[in-house]
Structure formats: structure tokens, C-alpha cells
């Protein structure tokens, strides 16, 4: 199963939210590029980036920050947040982003997904479904849609979408365990390749998700658990790595572990 570290960007900084609530954000680093390098040094094979400002406004607020990451990394980068037009998607793919995630627009403008799949490979266009109690939420999780999560997935499947990124909002950022039952229910009904997201706390959650591989879950996006060093391999890495190999001018507790 592929482990994909997440980088959420708000006001140009690397942050994590709790259940998508913007008033419950924690800043981890001032420069998201530095965070991307940390994850790459910990052997990440792909990075997942969300422009939270764009998710709210529909404008690519943090485009230049994301460009820096794509330029400096040697691994695929997937980007989501506020991608509501062909031009926005094209702008990211043109700078080397490997995969874009269509969220709100899949609900409000499914024709956009259809148009994108005429221009690009299904490996480049995926749909993100962020659900609360089985109902997809849109526009930075501030509004609910009028359908079930699996119904949206099946609609996207008919358009040619091959992969869904599925987030259980109730678990996201809570550090209380992955939404296993909700994810299992979704993948059984959707019958698609799925990247799970939201709530992974440690190795036990990964073992549980592995049991869903037979249904199509082949990867997982992890956020806060990685930032809080919940995996023993991270602790070993920080103990033996003297410097992170960047400017070491961090604004969080990571400075001590990385640069002492």
C-alpha cells in the first residue's frame, strides 16, 4: 500500500486542520517546500497537496508555493483544492503536477470532469469525495451535497474516472483512528480504485486498511499522524539524521528533532 504524506497550505504556510475547521488550524512550517523535502527524505514516493485557500475561494492562491515544491522534488505531486475550471487544471499540469484532484466541481459541475477526461488521462484526473455521515461536502467542507458518497462515485465512474480519494470528515485530523467502516462501505459500493484519507493514527490503522486492498484500496493519505511523529520509523530517522538538508529555520518543534 502506497503511503502518501499530505501537505495542506493556508496563507502560504503548511498547516493541519481538525475535521476541516479553519479555526482549528495548527501551523507546522512557514514554508511548505521545506515540509515536502522532509517527507521526501523520509522516502515518500508521492506528495498530496491541498490549497485550502483555493478550496474556499476557487482562486489558485498558493500556486507559486506549489510550483516550488513540484520544481524541487523528484517524485509525483498531486494537487487539490479549488480546481473548478479546465484552465486551472491545465495550469497545474503544465508545471509538472502529476495528478489533480477535482472535489467540489465533481458535484456542482460534473461536465468539467467529462471535459477533462477528453483532454487528459484518467491517471491525471481523480475525484476527491469528502463525506460526513455518507454525504459529500463541498467548498472547503462548508456545504453539503444532495447525494450519497457512493452515488457520486458511480456517477464519476460512468464519466470515465478510475480513482477516488475518499475522506471520512468525521475522522480527519482527530487522531482517533481511521474511518474503517465508512471506508469499507464506500469501496464495496463504488467498485473503484480508492485512496483512503482521514484519521490514520498509527500502524494499526494501516494494517486495517490493508484488509480493504481486495476492494480496491491501494493507497492512503496521511497527515497529522506523520506531523506528530506517530510512527516509530520516524523517531529513528530523526534520532540519526543530524540535519534535514535545508535551511533548518523551522517555526515549530520539528526544529529540535531535525537540526540539533
Curated annotation (Swiss-Prot):
Pathway: Amino-acid biosynthesis; L-histidine biosynthesis; L-histidine from 5-phospho-alpha-D-ribose 1-diphosphate: step 4/9
Entries under Gene3D superfamilies matching the protein: Aldolase class I (3.20.20.70)
Keyword check for Cytoplasm: yes
SUPFAM superfamilies assigned: Ribulose-phoshate binding barrel
Subcellular location as annotated: Cytoplasm
Chemical reaction(s) catalysed: 1-(5-phospho-beta-D-ribosyl)-5-[(5-phospho-beta-D-ribosylamino)methylideneamino]imidazole-4-carboxamide = 5-[(5-phospho-1-deoxy-D-ribulos-1-ylimino)methylamino]-1-(5-phospho-beta-D-ribosyl)imidazole-4-carboxamide
Enzyme class, spelled out: isomerase
Location (main, coarse): cytoplasm
UniProt keyword list: Amino-acid biosynthesis, Cytoplasm, Histidine biosynthesis, Isomerase
Gene Ontology biological process terms in this record: L-histidine biosynthetic process; L-tryptophan biosynthetic process
Enzyme Commission designation: 5.3.1.16
Gene Ontology CC, one term: cytoplasm
Top-level lineage group: Bacteria
Positions of the catalytic residues: 8, 130
GO molecular function terms attached to this record: 1-(5-phosphoribosyl)-5-[(5-phosphoribosylamino)methylideneamino]imidazole-4-carboxamide isomerase activity
Pfam family, one: His_biosynth
Keyword Isomerase recorded: yes
PANTHER family in the cross-refs: 1-(5-PHOSPHORIBOSYL)-5-[(5-PHOSPHORIBOSYLAMINO)METHYLIDENEAMINO] IMIDAZOLE-4-CARBOXAMIDE ISOMERASE
Family: Belongs to the HisA/HisF family.
Protein name: 1-(5-phosphoribosyl)-5-[(5-phosphoribosylamino)methylideneamino] imidazole-4-carboxamide isomerase
Organism: Chlorobium phaeobacteroides (strain BS1)
Amino acid at each position: 500500500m502506497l503511503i502518501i504524506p499530505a501537505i495542506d497550505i493556508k496563507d502560504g504556510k503548511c498547516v493541519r486542520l481538525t475535521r476541516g475547521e479553519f479555526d482549528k488550524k495548527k501551523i507546522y512550517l512557514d514554508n511548505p517546500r521545506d515540509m515536502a523535502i522532509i517527507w521526501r527524505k523520509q522516502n515518500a514516493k508521492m506528495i498530496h497537496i491541498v490549497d485550502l485557500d483555493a478550496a474556499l475561494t476557487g482562486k489558485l492562491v498558493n500556486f507559486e508555493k506549489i510550483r516550488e515544491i513540484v520544481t524541487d522534488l523528484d517524485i509525483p505531486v498531486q494537487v487539490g483544492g479549488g480546481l473548478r475550471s479546465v484552465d486551472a487544471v491545465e495550469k497545474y499540469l503544465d508545471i509538472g503536477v502529476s495528478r489533480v484532484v477535482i472535489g467540489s466541481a465533481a458535484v456542482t459541475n460534473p461536465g468539467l470532469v467529462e471535459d477533462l477526461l477528453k483532454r487528459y488521462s484518467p491517471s491525471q484526473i481523480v475525484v476527491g469525495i469528502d463525506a460526513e455521515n455518507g454525504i459529500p461536502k463541498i467548498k472547503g467542507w462548508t456545504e453539503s451535497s444532495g447525494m450519497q458518497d457512493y452515488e457520486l462515485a458511480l456517477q464519476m465512474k460512468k464519466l470515465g474516472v478510475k480513482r477516488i480519494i475518499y475522506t471520512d470528515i468525521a475522522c480527519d485530523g482527530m487522531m482517533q483512528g481511521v474511518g474503517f467502516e465508512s471506508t469499507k462501505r464506500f469501496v464495496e459500493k463504488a467498485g473503484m480504485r480508492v485512496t483512503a484519507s482521514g484519521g490514520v493514527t498509527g500502524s494499526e490503522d494501516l494494517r486495517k486498511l490493508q484488509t480493504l486492498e481486495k476492494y480496491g484500496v491501494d493507497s492512503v493519505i496521511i497527515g497529522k499522524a506523520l506531523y506528530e511523529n506517530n510512527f516509530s520509523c520516524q523517531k529513528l530517522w530523526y534520532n540519526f539524521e543530524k540535519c534535514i538538508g535545508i535551511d533548518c529555520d523551522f517555526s515549530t518543534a520539528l526544529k529540535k528533532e531535525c537540526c540539533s
